[in-house]
Amino acid sequence: MAKKSMIAKANRPAKFSSRAYTRCKICGRPHSVYRDFGICRVCLRKLANEGLIPGLKKASW
């Protein structure tokens, strides 16, 4: 889990727009966040395996 201070800092508007970055809405992870879902790859995989994200399924070929 991310520090609460870092999550609060990310929620504040950045002084410059180039400093803004995305964080996972569930765990607060700053890296590998999918913009379409707003969550990180770890949480995305967990929710997809549980079937909680409609239209998303594990690929097999």
UniProtKB/Swiss-Prot annotation:
Keywords associated with the record: Metal-binding, Ribonucleoprotein, Ribosomal protein, RNA-binding, rRNA-binding, Zinc
Family annotation (InterPro entries): Ribosomal_uS14, Ribosomal_uS14_bact, Ribosomal_uS14_CS, Ribosomal_uS14_sf
Any GO MF annotation of the entry: structural constituent of ribosome
Transmembrane segments: none
Biological processes, Gene Ontology terms: translation
Cofactor descriptive note: Binds 1 zinc ion per subunit.
Residues noted as binding Zn(2+) in the record, renumbered to the chain: 24, 27, 40, 43
Signal peptide range in chain numbering: none
GO annotations of cellular component type: cytoplasm; small ribosomal subunit
Cofactors named for this entry: Zn(2+)
Task of the protein: Binds 16S rRNA, required for the assembly of 30S particles and may also be responsible for determining the conformation of the 16S rRNA at the A site.
Family of this protein: Belongs to the universal ribosomal protein uS14 family. Zinc-binding uS14 subfamily.
Subunit details: Part of the 30S ribosomal subunit. Contacts proteins S3 and S10.
This protein's name: Small ribosomal subunit protein uS14
Organism: Campylobacter hominis (strain ATCC BAA-381 / DSM 21671 / CCUG 45161 / LMG 19568 / NCTC 13146 / CH001A)
